Regions:
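Consensus positions within tandem repeat domains that build extended binding/scaffold surfaces
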Residues: 144-146, 166-171, 189-194, 212-215, ...
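Sequence-pattern detector for short linear motifs
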Residues: 5, 9-10, 34-35, 67, ...
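Alpha-helix C-terminal capping segments
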Residues: 96, 286-287, 330-334
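Short intrinsically disordered, low-complexity segments
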Residues: 14, 18-21, 31-34, 38-41, ...
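N-terminal capping/linker segments that flank leucine-rich repeat
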Residues: 2-19, 23-149, 155-160, 252, ...
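Structural signature of tandem-repeat unit edges
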Residues: 105-108, 117-141, 151-164, 174-187, ...
């Protein structure tokens, strides 16, 4: 056998078999022949999966699935069902005197239900004469699905006095380019202009106070839109997948932006928020949009899950001082390069910056009390982090595979470091754990392949499995006197680890705790040691 560590373990196993429970503080070694004999007898297959397969294949997959599922995992939002439904009910109506329009009378008012075949430029009159009633009726409404799927309409002009447009009224009018609405229009119902793929020009009137979901989704040629202040809430998926939409202006009075409202607006570069009225941005509101920068007014207090996720062009963000938390996956998969978290933020939920591969700099406030798991998951460009004194816990997978992270400054009050918190941080060279820490979770510093020195203070009483797994350049380890158990696979595959002194507090050495430490020539074991597991 070629490895010194096998000599060491063979000696430990042989002597432990002869000396029950209590071992003196001695350095042990064994002759080559003894090592070969014992190792061949006791070296079984690993009884637990290695973190490289366990975390990368299982945890990483689960995390990615969780993030993509809540952070705009679909590349596009499917076209609403009613846009594909051949059974959409087209309204009945009777023709006008000139035969150009179809209508029905409801409560002494005319509703438009369609137009004559071949109509390209539609001008709707302000009144319609009904021959049966011998009366003029004001035109106030376009009925639901009135022009559904009409491929001939190109322009529509509505009269003064028009107050509403029904659901799906112009859905799928793929040649419609321009719509003129009067200031009297108050409501546009769901799907009204959905999939009008050539619509380039539409002005929403100041009178508008309601717009339903999907009203302008998949309007692929629409380039700009101004939302009037009377429209206090922007509906869900209202402009989703408007691929050419570049500019959005929200006038004072707009209070909330609905979920998926601008989802998939890949050309969207600028959103002008109102100064004081907007308070809420709902889930996935700008997911997969083309935004390059965001400046949220201080009136914004709530930004919901994944609101700006998958914004690959997003470089800079100014957060509102009115916010107290960052919700789950807010900027996951975005192109962020730097961000300063304001003092008002006390909580950062899971996955907020996960997979932000360009994120280099983050400033965390001293007011921060909670940072959940996977917040900086796989932020491969993050180089340094200063953790505030207000933070007591480093959560699981917090800096998982932040491969450029080379400088970590722990806060004065941190007491635990979670599982896989710094897993795969391959640019770290030294780990100095504060003397306030009592627990290191499983795989906390595993795969930190360039770490050469680790100091575990006396305050630490709990070292999890695999904690320093595969730290291939680790040579210098100091273990504090608070540790009683060197758990399974603790230093597994630390193949440059040469000399370790186990403190007097340790009573047990778990299986494979030093397995694969091929450079180890001696190990100091304390009188307190009660058991050594197989292949330790």
């Amino acid at each position: 056998m070629r490895s010194n560590w096998r000599k060491t373990i063979a000696g430990i196993v042989a002597i432990a078999a002869l000396i029950p429970c209590c071992l003196g503080t001695t350095a042990y070694a064994a002759p080559q022949s003894a090592a070969d004999t014992v190792i061949s007898a006791v070296m079984p297959e690993l009884e637990e999966p290695m973190p490289s397969s366990q975390v990368d294949a299982q945890i990483a997959a689960d995390v990615k699935a969780a993030i993509s599922g809540t952070a705009g995992g679909l590349e596009t939002i499917p076209t609403p069902n009613y846009a594909e439904d051949p059974d959409v009910e087209i309204p009945d109506g009777k023709p006008t005197q000139d035969g150009k329009l179809y209508y029905k009378i409801v409560s002494k008012k005319a509703q438009i239900t369609g137009c004559a075949p071949g109509t390209t430029d539609l001008v709707i009159p302000d009144t319609i004469y009904d021959e049966e009633d011998e009366e003029d009726y004001p035109v106030t409404f376009i009925a639901a699905a009135a022009f559904y799927g009409n491929k001939e309409l190109q322009t529509v002009t509505m009269p003064d006095g028009m107050v509403g447009i029904g659901a799906n009224a112009f859905l799928g009018c793929t040649n419609l380019t321009s719509v003129s609405m009067p200031d009297s229009v108050a409501s546009i119902n769901g799907g009204a202009f959905c999939s009008c793929s050539n619509l380039t020009d539409i002005k929403l009137p100041a009178s508008l106070y309601f717009v339903g979901d999907d009203a302008f989704s998949y309007c692929a040629s629409l380039e700009s839109i101004t939302i009037p202040g009377n429209l206090t809430s922007i509906g869900s998926t209202m402009f989703a997948n408007c691929a050419k939409l570049k500019t959005v202006v929200l006038e004072e009075g707009v209070q909330s932006i609905g979920s998926n409202a601008f989802y998939g607006c890949s050309s969207l570069d600028t959103v002008q928020f109102p100064e004081s009225s907007c308070t809420r941005i709902n889930a996935n509101a700008f997911t997969y949009s083309g935004l390059s920068s965001i400046e949220l007014p201080d009136s914004v207090t709530n930004v919901a899950t994944a609101a700006f996720s998958h914004c690959q062009n997003l470089k800079t963000v100014k957060l509102s001082s009115g916010m107290t938390s960052l919700r789950k996956d807010t900027f996951a998969y975005s192109g962020l390069e730097s961000i300063e978290i304001p003092d008002s933020i006390t909580t950062i939920k899971s996955g907020v910056f996960a997979y932000c591969s360009n994120l280099k700099s983050v400033t965390l406030p001293q007011t921060l009390k909670q940072v959940d798991e996977i917040v900086f998951y796989s932020c491969g460009s993050l180089e340094s982090i200063v953790l505030p004194d207000s933070l007591t816990k480093i959560s699981d997978n917090l800096f998982y595979r932040c491969t450029s992270l080379n400088d970590v400054k722990f806060g004065a009050n941190v007491n635990s470091i979670g599982a896989s918190a710094f897993y795969g941080c391959t640019s770290l060279t030294e780990v100095n754990i504060p003397d306030t820490v009592t627990k290191l979770g499983q795989s906390a510093f595993a795969e930190c392949t360039n770490v050469t020195k680790i100091t575990v203070p006396d305050s630490v009483t709990d070292l999890g499995k695999w904690t320093f797994y595969n730290n291939a350049n680790l040579t210098d380890v100091t273990i504090g006197n608070g540790v009683t158990n060197l758990d399974n696979y603790l230093f597994y595959r630390c193949n440059k680890l040469d000399n370790v002194t186990v403190p007097e507090s340790v009573k047990k050495v778990g299986q494979y705790a030093f397995g694969g430490c091929t450079s180890m020539s001696n190990i100091q074991l304390p009188d307190s040691l009660e058991s050594i597991d197989k292949c330790a």
